[in-house]
């Protein structure tokens, strides 16, 4: 199989290089080392042909294998004895283009591999054997081979390039390759076609992708496919590292935009999204401004500031409500206590009062299990009577020291039931009978 492919790719009937065959041979050699060895043997055989075109195509195929596969091919070239064959062709003063191509290939390869101290010094030896023999050609400036690895050029890309080249045939390939165009011009035209097709696909509604089938869009897709082939050819043949790097990147972008068009035609893209796809294009209808790192940081800071501000306001409001509840609680509790006392029956006054409640009151269990007023510190216990005087006014009889006023008070209030006041006022003082602080709040004002 390998020998047949090499024979077909180096046929003397070809008017120009069959890039489709060359790419297929590169893939075959990269997959299988045995096939790679057979390919090199077949190339060596074709180098012995008397037809200069066959020799030139064989040298170009060998150059492509060296640049894209690398070490394995170099080993096979040395083991198979291809280098002495190349040196012999140059010394024989055969066709000039073949001799020059071989000489430049040996020069570039031995330089890239490190010369005499490199991994394959055989290339250095073969090159300087020609130099010592007086062979000399006009060398290209900075002529170094560009190694395009399998990672840089995906295999599916090579397959698609192969399929397109097969469909177009040798005549189309010959016509395109015969045009000597600078790498910058090729890259510029391919970039222009890419941008135009991108804008057209951005305007296509993914829910109704009929716009992807019109004649104008299909022409753009065909143009991008053509430019993709030219870019791929540039990757394979150019020795300008910068141009090759740009061409590889542009080839990937062209492949993505073509895949996107196929997705639209097949209906795999159903919902428009504002997210950016892996190829850097937005799938929604409106252009989306890319967000830089600075914008993201500013938006994050603003979001954090808003969150902190709202949290701070919420905490302030919550604390304010709690303070208002604490301020209103004693007054409301006192009113509830008085209301409960007014409903209490006389016989309830003689019953033992609970330790933390009031007899006959309608206070909830939670209120019964908490003190009426928080206990005061020890140094403020003596001022408890004064603070209690600030509560709502209560009619209190004069102290026993003022006996005359006390008797007069009881006589005046004897008929209106005020004598029962001391009993009903139990639990409203901060001090017990012995003057100590108490949480029960039960005290008798009578003597």
Curated annotation (Swiss-Prot):
Q: Which InterPro entries match?
A: ENTH_VHS, GAT_dom, GAT_sf, TOL_plant, VHS_dom
Annotated Gene Ontology cellular components are: membrane; plastid
Q: Does the keyword Metal-binding apply?
A: no
Biased amino acid composition, Acidic residues? 322-331
Q: Supply the alphabetized keyword list.
A: Acetylation, Cytoplasm, Membrane, Protein transport, Transport
Function of the protein: Might contribute to the loading of the ESCRT machinery.
| Keyword hit for Transport | yes
Task: State the protein's name.
Answer: TOM1-like protein 5
GO process terms (BP): protein transport to vacuole involved in ubiquitin-dependent protein catabolic process via the multivesicular body sorting pathway
Per its UniProt entry, which superkingdom is the organism in? Eukaryota
Among Gene3D superfamilies, the record links this protein to: 1.20.58.160, 1.25.40.90
Q: What is the lineage of its organism?
A: Eukaryota, Viridiplantae, Streptophyta, Embryophyta, Tracheophyta
Q: Where is the composition biased (Basic and acidic residues)?
A: 402-415
Question: Could you tell me which PANTHER family the record lists for this protein?
Answer: TOM1-LIKE PROTEIN, TOM1-LIKE PROTEIN 5
Name the residue ranges with Low complexity bias. 437-447
Polar residues bias located where? Answer: 272-282, 303-314
Q: Which Pfam families match?
A: GAT, VHS
Spans annotated as Disordered:
164-184, 269-447
- Topological category with respect to the lipid bilayer: Peripheral membrane protein
* Every VHS domain range: 9-138
Where does the record place the GAT domain?
Answer: 178-266
Record-stated family: Belongs to the TOM1 family.
Return one GO MF term: ubiquitin binding
Tissue and organ distribution:
Preferentially expressed in siliques and cauline leaves.
